[in-house]
């Protein structure tokens, strides 16, 4: 399970005759249910089903950042809580030893079950209420990843890379941006059965399009470098871990969300 709070601020002139700030605060939570089954020596099938909850709170402010009331509300934002499944992943994965290293790879597809919304920018231009939050891509997207790990005395080390590629558009004309992820982490015993984990994560999201066109807002591309720290330990027949990821560097095009930290809690067996 993971969660974060994000903030987005932008100026609009659509609700009132004068420009006002939209101060949007979102709390995003996701629980991912993962199951694996072995089908041959070193080969297995993995299914990942995410369930998301997004809580949105909006405040309107004048240019001096004093709260104001918009009598007729906004077609863009509202106080609401959305929930539902994201796009599940179905993957084949394999692993093998190579000297002191363990190498692994997985490949599969994301299944378009997450809710998608009509073009919010087109609806906004027509003065109609709309929704920007997408729970899925609406397309079957290939997913592939590789990892390698080994131990150096008391220290474990692992590197990981993953890509989700989007080649088509969904029924609303939406094509999500490709996503790339890489990480490197080391772990070491710190107390009893507890192990400390520290690493770096790099995430890249390409530009989304609607009807083949890039809009002036939305996901226009961003790159995030994050530091991660956490602890893990065996628990019964499984393992428990807690991780915090803090953004170090963000490079984004256009007005995009900011977040202070991502917290993740997991249990596996």
Locate each region found by the language model.
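Outer-membrane beta-barrel channels and translocator barrels
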Residues: 40-42, 52, 97-101, 152-155, ...
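Transmembrane beta-barrel architecture of outer-membrane proteins
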Residues: 23-31, 85-89, 139-143, 177-181, ...
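Outer-membrane pore/translocation modules
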Residues: 54-176, 219
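Surface-exposed strand-loop-strand hairpins of Gram-negative outer-membrane beta-barrel proteins
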Residues: 1-30, 62-64
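Outer-membrane beta-barrel pore domains and translocons
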Residues: 1-4, 50-52, 95, 108-112, ...
């Amino acid at each position: 399970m993971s969660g974060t709070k994000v903030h987005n601020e932008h100026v609009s002139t659509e609700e009132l005759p004068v420009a006002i700030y939209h101060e949007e605060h979102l709390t995003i939570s996701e629980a991912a249910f993962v199951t694996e089954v072995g089908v041959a020596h070193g080969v297995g099938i993995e299914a990942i089903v995410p369930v998301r909850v997004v809580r949105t709170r909006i405040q309107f402010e004048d240019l001096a950042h004093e709260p104001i009331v918009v009598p007729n509300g906004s077609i863009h934002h509202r106080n609401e809580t959305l929930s539902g499944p994201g796009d599940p992943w179905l993957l084949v994965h394999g692993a093998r030893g190579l000297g002191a290293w363990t190498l692994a790879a997985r490949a599969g597809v994301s299944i378009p079950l997450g809710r998608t919304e009509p073009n919010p920018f087109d609806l906004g231009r027509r003065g109609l209420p709309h929704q920007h939050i997408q729970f899925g891509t609406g397309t079957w997207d290939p997913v592939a990843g590789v990892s390698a790990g080994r131990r150096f005395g008391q220290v474990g080390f692992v590197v990981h890379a993953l890509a989700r590629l989007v080649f088509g558009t969904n029924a609303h004309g939406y094509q999500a941006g490709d996503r790339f992820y890489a990480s490197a982490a080391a772990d070491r015993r710190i107390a009893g059965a507890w192990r400390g984990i520290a690493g770096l994560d790099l995430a890249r999201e390409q530009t989304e399009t609607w009807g083949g066109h890039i809009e002036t807002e939305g996901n226009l591309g961003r790159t995030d470098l994050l530091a991660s720290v956490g602890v893990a330990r065996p628990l019964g027949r499984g393992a428990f871990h807690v991780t915090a990821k803090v953004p170090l560097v963000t490079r984004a095009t256009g007005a995009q969300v900011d977040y202070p930290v991502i917290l993740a809690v997991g249990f596996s067996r």
